[in-house]
Amino acid sequence: MKFDTIIIGGGLAGLLAGIRLQRAGQDCALISTGQSAMHFWSGAFDLLNRLPDGTEVDYPLEGMQKLPMTHPYSVIGAEKVLAYLRSAVETFGSFGCRTHIPEELCNIFRLSTMGSLKRCFLTMDDLLTTSSPEEPLCRRALVANLDGFLDFNTEFIAKGLEDSGSPCRTVTIRLEALKKLRRSPTEMRSTNISRILDRPTFKEYVSQIREKYDGEDLIVLPSIFSLADSGDAIQLGKVMNTRVRFVATMPPSVPGIEIQRG
């Protein structure tokens, strides 16, 4: 087979480069060793968190001016970096994945799988984030996990919320459709769960959450839904007049795999 361009690396850079070249009419091949970085995607991307001397960066585009001239950001220039980021948002949107860049072009913080706050820049719209680690993420939170799902540790998530000043309550959802998966922890993985959460099962899942809801202003769910179903979960929050947000699970990443396949 003949290709106009062969791209080595299946992460965000390689994926977006391949998409742009294909849209320009080129035949491309994307080569990666094992699973691509998108299989481990948290739902957010860093841009520039620290300078080489360890200084933390609040405004990445401004921080690029302090990088060595040989750094890729310095070579490309901050204006082009921002243009590429906006192009990435449009590309993700074409796959049904809604992402955004902070209005003030500053780093924000996402709640990680381990319950700690991590700096990031480009994030999924429905990912649980905050503009400052010193501000509570909510007044009261409800963290809902699936029975037998070990890749979403509610104790870590709850501690992270409580450390930020947000009281938290955890609940477990038990779905009959997942009974076979629960027999083996190795089968109870995010991608397998996502395939089973079809419309009837998803409605049952939503129904159980509504039963356990007790006026919290934030519902935290594991990021195990297809891009279409995650939109339905956000609609659930609107019906209940509360926010619904997701926290990344341990790999594999359902939204990352869907974007790669898209």
Predicted regions: what is each one?
Residues 1-3, 173:
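Generic detection of short hydrophobic beta-strand segments and adjacent strand-loop junctions
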Residues 8, 30-32, 99-101, 170-171, ...:
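General beta-strand structural signal in soluble alpha/beta enzymes
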Residues 18, 82-85, 260:
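Short, hydrophobic/amphipathic alpha-helical packing segments
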Residues 24, 36, 40, 119-261:
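Predominantly flavin-linked oxidoreductase catalytic cores and closely associated redox partners
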Residues 33-69, 177-192:
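Conserved N-terminal glycine-rich FAD pyrophosphate-binding loop of Rossmann-like flavoproteins
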